[in-house]
């Protein structure tokens, strides 16, 4: 339901033999493609610091980027120059109580020097819930509202599209029309972008719409990270599965109208662009 996927541990006893690990990448990929209706795996999250997995991944073309526990590049989102293909990126592992200090230390640095806080977690408990609540209240919707929390796969695709998408603009009277070409790679799943329109007064914008390929759409007032210049921020998503996800969770709510199921249904419906379909789904969960 929109989450990222990646290779991690594979089912081999030969955990130090790259050829065996690679063979299991191939067999695991077949299972993933079958179970996820054609969606494939293109990332490796290195398990237990085992560099044999890295060697195996470098001989398996579908794996396009690797996240390491140590020895990788530090990801600085405001200083990324390329599309991160075949890049080794370092991730972090912290207990939830330590994460706020890690985040605050990065926020104190100049924008271009800030490292992404890449958090690995194998299970959750009350301490994780408390940390996530702090994150929301400080930097999320109920705080500064400057937080983005993508999976590694989603960030990789977003950065790839930032570097390779082609945006064409056309102005007709009071209407700005954007045509965006987004080239995808092998097993890409997240055809979505945010476009910051400088020189456009957000207060003067009365409506934003998208064509048939756009399934999710939102817009609002934003500012650039470097100099704080005001911009009209347009977020759009072309995932065909967005509508199917929304319909699924609305049906789950109708079968069992609990508060939790209602929250799930509203969450997925809210992702959709304004449309007759969205209105029909909202009426089913009011």
Which residues are covered by each model-predicted region?
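Metal-dependent polysaccharide deacetylase catalytic core of the NodB/CE4 family, i.e.
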Residues: 1-54, 61, 71-88, 114-115, ...
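Extracytoplasmic/secreted proteins, especially bacterial periplasmic and envelope-associated proteins
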Residues: 20-23, 27, 31, 52, ...
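C-terminal beta-strand-rich structural cap/linker in extracellular carbohydrate-active enzymes
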Residues: 186, 218-244
């Amino acid at each position: 339901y929109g989450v990222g996927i990646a290779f991690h541990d594979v089912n081999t006893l030969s955990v130090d033999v790259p050829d065996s690990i690679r063979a299991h990448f191939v067999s695991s990929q077949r299972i993933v493609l079958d179970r996820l209706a054609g969606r494939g795996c293109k990332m490796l999250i290195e398990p237990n610091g085992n560099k044999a997995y890295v060697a195996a991944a470098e001989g398996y073309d579908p794996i396009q980027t690797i996240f390491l526990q140590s020895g990788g590049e530090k990801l600085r989102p405001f200083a990324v120059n390329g599309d991160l293909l075949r890049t080794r990126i370092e991730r972090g592992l912290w207990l939830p109580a330590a994460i706020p200090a890690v985040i605050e230390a990065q926020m104190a640095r100049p924008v271009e020097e800030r490292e992404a806080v890449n958090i690995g977690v194998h299970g959750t408990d009350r301490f994780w819930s408390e940390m996530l609540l702090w994150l929301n209240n400080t930097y999320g919707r109920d705080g500064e509202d400057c937080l983005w929390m993508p999976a590694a796969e989603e960030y990789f695709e977003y950065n790839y599209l930032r570097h390779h998408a082609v945006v064409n603009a056309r102005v007709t009277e009071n209407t700005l029309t954007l045509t965006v070409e987004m080239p995808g790679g092998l097993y890409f799943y997240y055809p979505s972008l945010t476009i910051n329109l400088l020189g456009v007064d957000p207060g003067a914008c009365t409506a934003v719409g998208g064509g048939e390929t756009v399934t999710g759409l939102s817009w609002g007032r934003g500012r650039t990270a470097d100099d704080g210049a005001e911009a009209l921020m347009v977020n759009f998503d072309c995932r065909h599965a967005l509508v199917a996800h929304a319909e699924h969770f609305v049906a789950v709510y109708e079968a069992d109208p609990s508060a939790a199921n209602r929250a799930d249904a509203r969450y997925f419906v809210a992702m959709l662009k304004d449309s007759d379909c969205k209105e029909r789904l909202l009426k089913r969960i009011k």
